[in-house]
Design a protein with these regions (language model features):
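Midchain, well-structured core segments that form catalytic/ion-binding scaffolds
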Residues: 171-172, 176-340
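A non-catalytic alpha/beta surface segment that caps or lines the substrate-entry region
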Residues: 68-114
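N-terminal capping segment at the start of a domain
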Residues: 45-80, 372, 427-429
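N-terminal secretory signal peptides and thylakoid transit peptides that target proteins
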Residues: 2-19, 23-26
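Catalytic-core environment of secreted peptidases
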Residues: 97, 109-141, 146
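Alpha-helical metal-binding/catalytic segments enriched in His/Glu/Asp
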Residues: 124, 134-172, 263-267, 276-299, ...
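Zn-dependent metallopeptidase/amidohydrolase metal-coordination segment
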Residues: 48, 66-69, 122-126, 396-446, ...
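A short beta-alpha structural unit
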Residues: 78, 310-319, 331-337, 363-382, ...
Length: 461
């Protein structure tokens, strides 16, 4: 272990213990400010950091050119030509950082930096594909931030015990084939050869697209990461929600990624003449379903916490201006970090639906469509994120990720943790998506320090 690294790890450990025991707030703040950096490469105010914020900004701005749209955001759909061009740029960045690059059978890109010991891999990264008319920060921050961490380590001649790998997961957004987190899902063993014949809107199969990537679809399952291969996975990401921005907190410690359940509901009444049917004799499916939608919102809002419930659309039949709707179809989606809470809320929603059935003389039946269990972040990794942020004097907030992430899949096979940086006004999946360069630099510096802390703390037995 080089001297700078040893001094940093010894000092951060002792200082954090002392800071947490300080009962007088000014003393605690002074204590935190005394934690030194690993090496002097850059200063922000009175704090010295290792990542080069201008270099990181430059790579993010360059990446935003691939698929740029007139609104100022990007459309960089997974497996598209713009995605392929962006991937080539990322591969060259990895190679210039001295990483050994490989692409697995699912199209995931890995850049490896050797460690000094034969230990499991510390993996970190994100994705670079976007939604239609998306923003410049979702996925990109964690991808470019991961490469910047490696470049900063090269600058400081830092060596690690564990091998380090930066990963760019393919097709996280799922615009093709209706399969989000596709690359990470294959890597985690959750998706296999059964998905190869799924077609997109152009009639092309996943196998067709993989061949365009230069991959052999028959070897798709070779992309699975073997059990025990990873010491942990870290993902730096924008929050995509409002909480950090509202509270002016620079770093989010992600407790886990919420689970979700989705139902398809059908309300059946009786289609009848709109002019001749008295109001008190109507069995209006659309009116009843509209009450159901409001009931979902009211029940979800009634509980404390960060649970959310959504009805994304409604279809009414027969859909004529002069006919009372006899059928109305709508979905219900519930998300929370606690599956039991989702189930409890759903029970209350169903009770409200039963009341509305009686009031409107209709019947409503709901069928479970999809269920994803929550993915909890590893406690040791959460602690390392807090320690790294404290060493920089950065406040943290514990919060869940309400959006699906690649980390949710990798949590099935390895300890996982996520670092959030604020999203201005909570906007994401939009050209107006924005995170400040300072917040992004803070997140990358925290990632840098977390990698070193985990490298020091893990696999000591």
């Amino acid at each position: 272990m080089n001297t700078d690294r040893r001094n940093f790890l010894q000092t951060i450990g002792g200082t954090l213990v002392a800071c947490r025991s300080a009962s007088f707030l000014p003393l605690a703040l002074l204590c935190l400010a005394s934690v030194p950096p690993l090496s002097r490469s850059q200063e922000t105010g009175s704090l010295k950091t290792h990542v080069n914020s201008q270099r990181l900004q430059g790579t993010l701005e360059k990446l935003s050119e691939f698929g740029r749209n007139p609104e100022g955001g990007v459309t960089r759909i997974g497996y598209s030509e713009t995605d392929m061009a962006a991937r080539e740029y990322v591969i060259e960045l990895m190679k210039s950082a001295g990483l050994e690059v490989r692409i697995d059978a699912a199209g995931n890109i890995f850049g490896r930096r050797a460690g000094s010991e034969k230990l499991p891999i510390l993996l970190f990264g994100s994705h670079i594909d976007s939604v239609m008319h998306g923003g410049n920060f979702d996925g990109d921050v964690g991808s470019m931030g991961g490469i910047e961490v490696i470049r900063a380590m090269n600058d400081g001649k830092v060596k690690t015990r564990h091998p380090l790998e930066v990963v760019i997961w393919t097709n996280e957004e799922g615009n093709h084939f209706g399969l989000g987190t596709l690359g990470s899902g294959v890597a985690a063993g959750l998706l296999g050869s059964e998905i190869l014949e799924r077609k997109d809107e152009q009639g092309l199969t996943l196998a067709d697209w993989l061949r365009r990537y230069g991959q052999d679809p028959s070897h798709l399952t070779d992309a699975r990461i073997p059990p025990g291969a990873l010491a942990g996975f870290l993902e730096l990401h924008i929050e995509q929600g409002p909480y950090l921005d509202e509270k002016k907190i620079p770093i989010g410690v992600v407790q886990g990624i919420v689970g979700l359940k989705r139902w398809k509901c059908l309300t059946t009444g009786f289609a009848n003449h709109a002019g001749t049917t008295p109001m008190n004799r109507r069995r209006d499916a659309l009116a009843a379903a509209s009450k159901d939608v409001l009931a979902v919102r009211e029940v979800v809002r009634a509980d404390t916490g960060r649970q959310v419930g959504t009805v994304g659309y409604m279809k009414a039949e027969p859909g004529a201006i002069n006919v009372i709707p006899g059928r109305a179809e709508f979905p219900v989606e519930l998300r929370d970090l606690d599956t039991a809470k989702i189930d409890h809320i759903w029970e209350r929603i169903q009770a409200r639906f039963k009341q509305i059935e009686k009031e409107e003389s209709v019947e409503t039946h709901c069928e479970l469509l999809e269920e994803n269990a929550p993915a909890r972040s590893d406690t040791a990794i959460q602690n390392a994120i807090r320690d790294a942020a404290e060493s920089l004097g950065l406040a943290t907030m514990d919060l869940p990720s309400a959006a699906v992430q690649d980390s949710q899949q990798i949590a099935k096979i390895a300890p996982m943790g996520m670092i959030f940086v604020p999203s201005r006004d909570g906007i994401s999946h939009s050209p107006k998506e924005f995170s400040s360069w300072q917040d992004i630099a803070n997140g990358a510096e925290v990632l840098y320090r977390v990698v070193l802390l985990l490298d020091d703390r893990l696999n000591r037995n």
